[in-house]
Amino acid sequence: MATSGVEKSSKKKTEKKLAAREEAKLLAGFMGVMNNMRKQRTLCDVILTVQERKIPAHRVVLAAASHFFNLMFTTNMLESKSFEVELKDAEPDIIEQLVEFAYTARISVNSNNVQSLLDAANQYQIEPVKKMCVDFLKEQVDASNCLGISVLAECLDCPELKATADDFIHQHFTEVYKTDEFLQLDVKRVTHLLSQDTLTVRAEDQVYDAAVRWLKYDEPNRQPFMVDILAKVRFPLISKNFLSKTVQAEPLIQDNPECLKMVISGMRYHLLSPEDREELAGGTRPRRKKHDYRIALFGGSQPQSCRYFNPKDYSWTDIRCPFEKRRDAACVFWDNVVYILGGSQLFPIKRMDCYNVVKDSWYSKLGPPTPRDSLAACAAEGKIYTSGGSEVGNSALYLFECYDTRTESWHTKPSMLTQRCSHGMVEANGLIYVCGGSLGNNVSGRVLSSCEVYDPATETWTELCSMIEPRKNHGLVFVKDKIFAVGGQNGLGGLDNVEYYDIKLNEWKMVSPMPWRGVTVKCAAVGSVIYVLAGFQGVGRLGHILEYNTETDKWIANSKVRAFPVTSCLICVVDTCGANEETLET
């Protein structure tokens, strides 16, 4: 039987691998023999003197492993003719290990020797050892050592290591500035660090706290640097309350006229109109925001049942919920506040309940001008948009309204192209997308597949490609340029199918179905994962949470984590960074 081309190719690859292994084995054997000769001082032509230790070697081996020794032995340097070469300012054990590496290509890098090895490998230009040390240190970076590693990397010209350390410093600044390493930094490094836009903080008052901590650590000697250090704090970004109660009361500030001017300037900023604020640069440029995303679920028809779901550890945390129950309401999150609006309890509810996740406080505002249930809502650029819905059992509405969180005022916007209720709505890239729903909450209300998009800049609606499956009471989430419609129900019953809208292509595509069929689906996305946390099947509720990875198109039914018990709940993603930790305890 003739051998196929594929079999021949596979055979050749196998033969090459075996030959390469044999070559490596032979080379290791040769180098092992040479290393034994070195230890026995056989044919050695150079002695490295480190302090009082004598280390024999062969020039050719050292020259092959180290560019430093290559230049030393192949040029007209004095050492090229000397049998004994003295290495000053070197550690005997470290040089011994480097020489051993030249013969064996093996070396042990650990926390006790990594700094000395990196220093020596850098000095004697032994790149493989330098890389091993850099890789080791990159894995060891944490809040307690990142500043020191950054300084070391800068001194030894290791840009890759420095980038890793600096990125860690910026991402974990709120932990780093509380360490001893930070307090012992020199003024130049502190000034540079506090000026970075990429510092990840909950709010600018944390940068202020870092600056004051550093100054007070050695106040007599750091007094001359006070203005330079505090000038890096962006006072206009600090809340008016913190400026007046904490910053102004700080003795360091009170005793320094220049620093006091900075604080007053920050307070004046809060009195400016939004237009005037935009004209200011530098001092009002925001830092990189620190986030702690959780999914908030509010009981709706059972208001006493409200919780956070933490996707990091799959934990549930209770939320204090004093608001009255509402059926078929909506909720959105913007700037630390969850807005619960619409819904009904015998009659439409006019009030909008608001929950500040940072302060753990509830209060009320005037709700939409047209009270209704089965509406959809989303937030964009400081505005909350509500669409459609029905006025307790009536037909669906075309209505589209907007609440400005800055002016606390409601405005009616151009109506949707299609009347709808029990639909989904999301913000994506500054535009508002509305998908599915039905023409009414009664049995005869036709389920819709139509979709449309609203542009706040032009205040116009545009019809989009319809969904493959008509659906209402579905989940609708935005993940990386795709809008996912999850489950829900059509005219025949509950759905397990899932489809996504490709914004760039204006088309819908089906993906893997859920391992559960839901008449109503309550889901939200954090990162690239969609979490289905509650839902109703028609005869029972969802028992355990479901996870969908949008990158792998895989569903997981997490049997260890119970789903939220209220199927009529409201759901939204919130950022709890800065919230009182006591309110987040399970």
UniProtKB/Swiss-Prot annotation:
Carries keyword Cytoplasm? Answer: yes
Which PROSITE patterns does the annotation name? BTB
Q: What are this entry's molecular-function GO terms?
A: protein homodimerization activity
* The Kelch repeat ranges on this chain: 294-336, 337-382, 383-430, 431-481, 483-528, 530-575
UniProt lists the gene as Klhl7
Show the InterPro entries listed in the entry.
Answer: BACK, BTB-kelch_protein, BTB/POZ_dom, BTB/POZ_KLHL7, Kelch-typ_b-propeller, Kelch_1, KLHL7_BACK, SKP1/BTB/POZ_sf
Q: What is its main location?
A: nucleus
Residue ranges constituting the BTB domain according to the UniProt record: 44-111
Question: Which species does the entry assign this protein to?
Answer: Mus musculus
- One Pfam match, given by its short name, reads Kelch_KLHDC2_KLHL20_DRC7
Gene Ontology BP terms? protein ubiquitination
List where in the cell it is found: Nucleus; Cytoplasm
Give the multimer and partner information: Homodimer. Component of the BCR(KLHL7) E3 ubiquitin ligase complex, at least composed of CUL3 and KLHL7 and RBX1.
UniProt keyword annotations, A-Z: Cytoplasm, Kelch repeat, Nucleus, Repeat, Ubl conjugation pathway
The organism's superkingdom is given as Eukaryota
What function does this protein fulfil? Substrate-specific adapter of a BCR (BTB-CUL3-RBX1) E3 ubiquitin ligase complex. The BCR(KLHL7) complex acts by mediating ubiquitination and subsequent degradation of substrate proteins. Probably mediates 'Lys-48'-linked ubiquitination.
Q: Which CDD domains match?
A: BACK_KLHL7, BTB_POZ_KLHL7
Q: Where is the BACK domain?
A: 146-248
Which pathway does this polypeptide act in?
Protein modification; protein ubiquitination
UniProt-recorded name of the protein? Kelch-like protein 7
Question: Which Gene Ontology cellular component annotation is one that this UniProt entry carries?
Answer: plasma membrane
